[in-house]
Curated annotation (Swiss-Prot):
Disulfide bonds: none annotated. This is UPF0561 protein C2orf68. PANTHER family: UPF0561 PROTEIN C2ORF68. Residues 91-104 have a biased composition (Low complexity). Belongs to the UPF0561 family. It comes from the Eukaryota. It comes from Homo sapiens (Human). Pfam families: UPF0561.
Amino acid sequence: MEAGPHPRPGHCCKPGGRLDMNHGFVHHIRRNQIARDDYDKKVKQAAKEKVRRRHTPAPTRPRKPDLQVYLPRHRDVSAHPRNPDYEESGESSSSGGSELEPSGHQLFCLEYEADSGEVTSVIVYQGDDPGKVSEKVSAHTPLDPPMREALKLRIQEEIAKRQSQH
């Protein structure tokens, strides 16, 4: 019983049953393994960079719109006729001087964030009219009438809530 012709050395299989590393298929496998390892290293490195970036300092503007911020008023009103809370005072100064000198104490700081990401801050005092406050916000950030009315109602609720606390 003869198994057949014995393979010649270097032709089909080498003695010992090892793979022929010169074969083209093995080169493709090794190239794919190396590419996979390189890609895996890049992904792990990017994940490490992302974790490092999370520990950066917080942004300068507050993320919560109801965050109360204390801004002391100037004692000498004649030296500072404008309230620094109302930026771009061209719109607010033309509507009257009583808005610049609030009659009551500070209730809360209203911060409205527009769709563009711009934040408008207005301090609401005890005697303020919700309609005028919503007009101040819409002077900085254009609002359509239904949004302005909704903002007015929300300001009214917040004023009532804070006045009941004091």
